[in-house]
């Protein structure tokens, strides 16, 4: 088989773009907690000494947005000007308006209800925007995710853990990881390169202290969990030589700039829509979760080794305008039979997705860092494999 390398990256909770995502989702959760039908589209910009939140919201509740912002930044660990940012004293600016009534009328009263015929109440809610969304799954890991992004997220989570628990006390919140895996055909066989960039306190010796600590406490424990040749992998720690200035002081952060980190690490296609700060009436988010659910159940059912699912919507219309499956030649049944089974087993109208995945809950803060997919947490309903039997029955397996 042909050998090739594939690389994915992740970032920690202190990366400026991820701070922005976490703030946007914390605001969303606060609104959904009191008003599950809140319509929320909130964007965050964070830079040296300042956080600006803007967007469109329609809700019956009130939330103290400046307090939410400050609490989230302090929780992440930016609590001192010595670290380059202090959530207690930074400037906060909020510019929130209402959702456009032109958009709202299409969501509240779908095209089917106005121009066609409705067959149940799920036909009444239209998609919150046009667009295309992708979901993916493969059999490389127990979570049915590509291995490079799974490893990269595990390293980022571990990097945050050793900072928080004091194992490596001189680390600071900003950090990135990158993993290059060698494949033999479609099978991951060897860890080639690991890159870890972590913000740290001043005057830390890279060669004698930081690199050995990262290898011992972060990389080796994570790599040991996976059945992968890793005897001679290359480790690059802070390749610039120093990473003292980080977080919003080092780079401005924006909601929605880590969409590949949030999904499959580049292993699958992406429709372009970000997730954080959006309530589930926005199909950018809810349909991406639904297509992951579809893809994972297909692989879990043994109907394909790899599958990518695309769904597309027109704004204000309940039914998708298109559904497409790509199995890369790994399907165990005829592709047209598999597509028919998916349409029979899964209802991809926005209201049905929200119902089936129970998305009107304040669950989104936990999605906003370390990946929206592949983490089998109780609230991540799109990670369930609860339609396996129905899919098998639909294809006669």
Curated annotation (Swiss-Prot):
GO terms for biological process: one-carbon metabolic process; S-adenosylmethionine biosynthetic process. Its cofactor is Mg(2+); K(+). Its main location: cytoplasm. Mg(2+) binds at residue 17. K(+) binds at residue 43. InterPro entries: ADOMET_SYNTHASE_CS, S-AdoMet_synt_C, S-AdoMet_synt_central, S-AdoMet_synt_N, S-AdoMet_synthetase, S-AdoMet_synthetase_sfam. It is found in: Cytoplasm. Binds 2 divalent ions per subunit. GO terms for cellular component: cytoplasm. Homotetramer; dimer of dimers. This is S-adenosylmethionine synthase. The gene is metK.
């Amino acid at each position: 088989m042909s050998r090739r390398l594939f690389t994915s990256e992740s970032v920690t909770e202190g990366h400026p773009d991820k701070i922005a995502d976490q703030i946007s989702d914390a605001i969303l959760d606060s609104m959904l907690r009191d008003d599950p039908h809140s319509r929320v589209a909130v964007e965050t910009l964070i830079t040296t000494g300042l956080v600006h939140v803007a967007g469109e919201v329609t809700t019956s509740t009130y939330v103290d947005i400046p307090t939410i912002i400050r609490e989230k930044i302090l929780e992440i660990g930016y609590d001192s000007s010595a670290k380059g940012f202090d959530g207690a004293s930074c400037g906060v600016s909020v510019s929130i308006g209402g959702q456009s009534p032109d958009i709202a009328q299409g969501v509240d009263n779908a095209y089917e209800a106005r121009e066609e015929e409705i067959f149940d109440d799920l036909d009444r809610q239209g998609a919150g925007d046009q667009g295309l969304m992708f979901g993916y799954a493969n059999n490389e890991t127990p979570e049915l995710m590509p291995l490079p992004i799974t490893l990269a997220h595990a390293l980022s989570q571990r990097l945050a853990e050793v900072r928080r628990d004091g194992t490596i006390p001189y680390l600071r919140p900003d950090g990135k990881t990158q993993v290059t895996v060698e494949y033999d055909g479609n099978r991951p066989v060897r860890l080639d390169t690991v890159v870890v960039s972590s913000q740290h306190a001043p005057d830390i010796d890279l060669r004698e202290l930081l690199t050995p600590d990262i290898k011992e406490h972060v990389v080796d424990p994570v790599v040991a969990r996976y059945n992968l040749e890793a005897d001679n992998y290359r480790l690059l720690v802070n390749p610039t030589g120093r990473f003292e200035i980080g977080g919003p002081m080092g780079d401005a952060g924006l909601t929605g700039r880590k969409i590949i980190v949030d999904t499959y690490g580049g292993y699958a296609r992406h429709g372009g829509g970000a997730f954080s700060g959006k309530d589930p009436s926005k199909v950018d988010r809810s349909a991406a979760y639904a297509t992951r659910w579809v893809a994972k159940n297909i692989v879990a059912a043994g109907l394909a080794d790899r599958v990518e699912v695309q769904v597309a919507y027109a704004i204000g219309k309940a039914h998708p305008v298109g559904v497409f499956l790509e199995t890369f030649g790994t399907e165990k049944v005829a592709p047209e039979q598999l597509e028919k089974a998916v349409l029979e087993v899964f209802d991809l109208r926005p209201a049905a997705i929200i119902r089936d995945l129970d998305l009107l809950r304040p669950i989104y803060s936990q999605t906003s860092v370390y990946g929206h997919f592949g983490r089998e947490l109780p609230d991540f309903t799109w990670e369930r494999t609860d339609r396996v039997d129905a899919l098998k029955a639909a294809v006669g397996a």
